[in-house]
Amino acid sequence: MPPKAADKKPANKAPATASKAPEKKDAGKKTAASGEKKKRTKARKETYSSYIYKVLKQVHPDTGISNRAMSILNSFVNDIFERVATEASKLAAYNKKSTISSREIQTSVRLILPGELAKHAVSEGTKAVTKYSSSTK
């Protein structure tokens, strides 16, 4: 049976003027004075927005993009990434390997993307891996 209203103790609430938005503090300063609670740092939201924007400016320097369109493209990239990673994981499991290599990624791209799009994606991916390999030597 729940306690009656008379039995409840009043909760210590923040003043009504306090907003729910986190206060702006210096990220480097963490103070734990007596009685003060530590502020939880805001979780970072990782997106592909900056990379999408850079590619847009390379292709169409005078064109902008709305926040909604950026959000849609970000969801699209996340979806394709997840599909390729899942397929590559399955391919590695079929071949009894515990490591996903560039070969599994390439095969999964060929399986997921249709026709000409897969060919272009594979060639761009191969070019990127070659460029990375030559720069690390």
Swiss-Prot record:
Compartments in which it is found: Nucleus; Chromosome
GO cellular component terms, alphabetically, are: nucleosome; nucleus
CDD domains from the entry? HFD_H2B (cd22910)
Region of interest (Disordered), ranges: 1-45
Q: Which InterPro entries does UniProt cross-reference here?
A: Histone-fold, Histone_H2A/H2B/H3, Histone_H2B, HISTONE_H2B_site
SUPFAM superfamilies noted in UniProt: Histone-fold
Q: Which UniProt keywords apply?
A: Acetylation, Chromosome, DNA-binding, Isopeptide bond, Nucleosome core, Nucleus, Ubl conjugation
User: Signal peptide position in this chain?
Assistant: none
Could you give a GO molecular-function term held by this entry? structural constituent of chromatin
Q: Which Pfam families match?
A: Histone
Q: What does this protein do?
A: Core component of nucleosome. Nucleosomes wrap and compact DNA into chromatin, limiting DNA accessibility to the cellular machineries which require DNA as a template. Histones thereby play a central role in transcription regulation, DNA repair, DNA replication and chromosomal stability. DNA accessibility is regulated via a complex set of post-translational modifications of histones, also called histone code, and nucleosome remodeling.
Recorded protein name is: Histone H2B
What is the organism of origin for this protein? Podospora anserina
